[in-house]
């Protein structure tokens, strides 16, 4: 056990985690040069296309130093804020972490968030300054930043270039000499934490575990403590990006895959504890938090008969991504669909894209919302994720909305833009700190609802892409909120309702109906598009009717003849207007998302 090192790589997006992982894998010879591809740890197509890591991946590396053979378990983590729970999960199973910082960009908001998770887990952190081959690289400035913001001693920081391979050997030596070996006891009852699980079409549900004490062998009967179920171990493997390597036992300190031949991944939930059924543990491994969805949106199939296909697709996707929650819902406008909970906006995009790609579905997504708490006049508390669940106005005492604590790091020249943006989004400043003469760290409390739409894009565009942003949920606060409904031809379209602050309702309503007017196709009758709060109409636009020239067949002659025809047409239009139905195109639902 003294020759095992468990470590993960933490970094902000685009600071070169996956490339560094590639170099370490190559240096240790875990994958032959012929099989090597760039970002080998990113297995999903979406990951490679977007250049992001979504699922944490593991690999077991062998490395010899001073005549001794060492086993290095590398766990690659995502960098994006939506997937930070993947990070906390990965770090819970390590003794050390490589903090990778781009030598030209410096410390970013995400870097700080991930470091705090690592420090809470008492990990040994090795600062790694990456991309030193870039012309704009300034390792000395970056070391100062790490010391100033995070307070880590950077005298032993290692400078590498993952692209060219400079400094990789020194890094491997540092991992072995500075990260402590796992401490566990093989003679104690078996204690293993499931820190990832996924579904394999041939082997069933697989659990990736970190063994703390004892050991697990093939054919053992094990107990999954969360479910209380017993299973036989069919196979054990070490993770490897090309093909896992089989083994007979996993003992204390090791990381490996347990094959139990289960049909359902919910039997091996992430964060659960595995122990031997003949000599079980008294207490499961603690300190592990489940991922809670923050953002909710309705997903509906465009072809209504594909509802069951969507249910199957969500069931299968949940096997690999336990953080999704979903329940069926119906909408007058869109038919049958699901209310799906996500970790954040990027997660929502990725899930929708995976459903459309991997399961060949066409979906409509409604505007994302957060969970509100409603206190009714009769004292009852409700939690709602869908604006249409809001009780009537006279029954509401107050509405509470979730707030987040946001950390933003930006070049100081954009400070004015950012403060304006945050004030428009009802942000409350709690801290402002100059890291260096030209970079500022801001902390704000912001309603979650204000960042769930397009905040990230607006932040990037108002700072030319230089600002970085991270958030964590904080608390619920009373808000001055109302429900804004949209009526088309007198019918309320439930899928377009949103909850907004009263101060913004008027402008939001006006923008809403303007955008809708451009999209609703012209009918043979006039269509009124209205925005309302309760029974009060606050904005209206009219889509003019298409005219048919009924007087074309009259040549000259009496004006009363023409008037009679026009009156008759008017009557007909009135009747049509009373019973006419308007079909809304898909863009109508998307336009709601675009309104600022």
Swiss-Prot record:
The alphabetized UniProt keywords are: Cell inner membrane, Cell membrane, GTP-binding, Hydrolase, Membrane, Nucleotide-binding, Protein biosynthesis
Catalytic activity annotation: GTP + H2O = GDP + phosphate + H(+)
Binding-site list for GTP: 14-19, 130-133
The protein's enzyme class: hydrolase
Membrane topology field:
Peripheral membrane protein
**Which compartment or compartments is the protein found in?**
Cell inner membrane
**Assigned EC number:** 3.6.5.n1
**Entry's Gene Ontology cellular component terms:** plasma membrane
Which superkingdom? Answer: Bacteria
What positions does the domain tr-type G occupy?
2-183
**GO biological process annotation, one example:** positive regulation of translation
A molecular function (GO) held by this record is: translation elongation factor activity
Q: Which family does it belong to?
A: Belongs to the TRAFAC class translation factor GTPase superfamily. Classic translation factor GTPase family. LepA subfamily.
Q: Which PANTHER family match?
A: TRANSLATION FACTOR GUF1 HOMOLOG, CHLOROPLASTIC, TRANSLATION FACTOR GUF1-RELATED
Enumerate the HAMAP family for this protein.
Answer: LepA
- Give the protein's biological function: Required for accurate and efficient protein synthesis under certain stress conditions. May act as a fidelity factor of the translation reaction, by catalyzing a one-codon backward translocation of tRNAs on improperly translocated ribosomes. Back-translocation proceeds from a post-translocation (POST) complex to a pre-translocation (PRE) complex, thus giving elongation factor G a second chance to translocate the tRNAs correctly. Binds to ribosomes in a GTP-dependent manner.
Record's protein name: Elongation factor 4
